[in-house]
Amino acid sequence: MSVHDLCCIGYITQDKIVTTKNTIYMPGGTSFYFAHAIKHLDPNGFLLVTSLAHTEMNVVEDIRKEGIEVKALPSARSVCFENIYGENQNERTQRVTAKADPFTMEGLQDVNARIIHLGSLLADDFSLEGIKFLSGKGLLSVDGQTGRKREKL
């Protein structure tokens, strides 16, 4: 059983960014940005766990090319956000346009790390049972993203 020093569990998202000037599509999410920060440090001993649709696996492959170990759990869909910015770039409206399958204890059974960071984006990303399960595997931290105006389709 391999034990990593650090593990981040969270969704790599497919984001639609709408501004007054253009619209772009790009990957995002806590786990995506976490992995890109880690690659500038020593990625040895780091594991990224995500869940996304097969159509987005190219993002995982790009992260792996950066020397990051990734466990990608299959999902029928990826989490998709639409972020709409007006003239004031400090204000946005965010809509959830698709959700991935939830993380399960079964899918995380072989994840072992001294520190596990949950990059939570939505309230139901991790069940209470899953959080309790992971807390028995290592020191647990959670990135709870709240306080944003979100609309769900």
Feature roles, as predicted:
Residues 3-4, 14-25, 40-119, 124, ...:
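Conserved N-terminal subdomain of the carbohydrate kinase-like
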Residues 10, 74-76, 144:
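Residues at the C-termini of beta-strands that transition into short coil/loop
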Residues 11-12, 30:
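Active-site metal-binding loops of divalent metal-dependent hydrolases
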Residues 29-40:
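Histidine-anchored nucleotide/phosphate-binding helix
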Residues 120, 144-146:
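Short, structured patches in soluble enzyme cores that scaffold and shape functional sites
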Residues 135-137, 146-153:
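Conserved phosphate/ATP/ADP-binding segment of small-molecule kinases
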